[in-house]
Amino acid sequence: MTVQSNNKLASQVCEACHVDAPKVSDEELKELIGLIPDWVPQVRDNVMMLEREYKFKNYKLAWAFANKVSELAESEFHHPSILLEWGKVTVTWWTHSIGGLHKNDFICAAKTDQLGD
């Protein structure tokens, strides 16, 4: 992954998303996932999501990272699932209102990657 590719998404701002907002197409998914290759598309309960696991040396560092993700979520008004475990944080982004992936999810995934830098 190039930092420039990730920055292309991370420099963008989430837009307000409503129930009738379009989900990303298969073509858009291929393009956008190429910009954040450490993220894995997952389908749960027929809902496409983006997921990534981050590893840390201990619980305290994982907790600090989870807090940073929470602050990002509030600033973007877009909220992921965050699973905090000893030495590990799993972040899952999807757009609840449309039941799938929107460009906002990719923007937030890219911004999440930058939190560890």
From Swiss-Prot:
Database matches in HAMAP family: Pterin_4_alpha
Name used for this protein in its record: Putative pterin-4-alpha-carbinolamine dehydratase
Alphabetical keyword list: Lyase
CDD domains, per database record: PCD_DCoH_subfamily_a
SUPFAM superfamilies membership: PCD-like
Organism field: Colwellia psychrerythraea (strain 34H / ATCC BAA-681)
Top-level taxon: Bacteria
E.C. numbers: 4.2.1.96
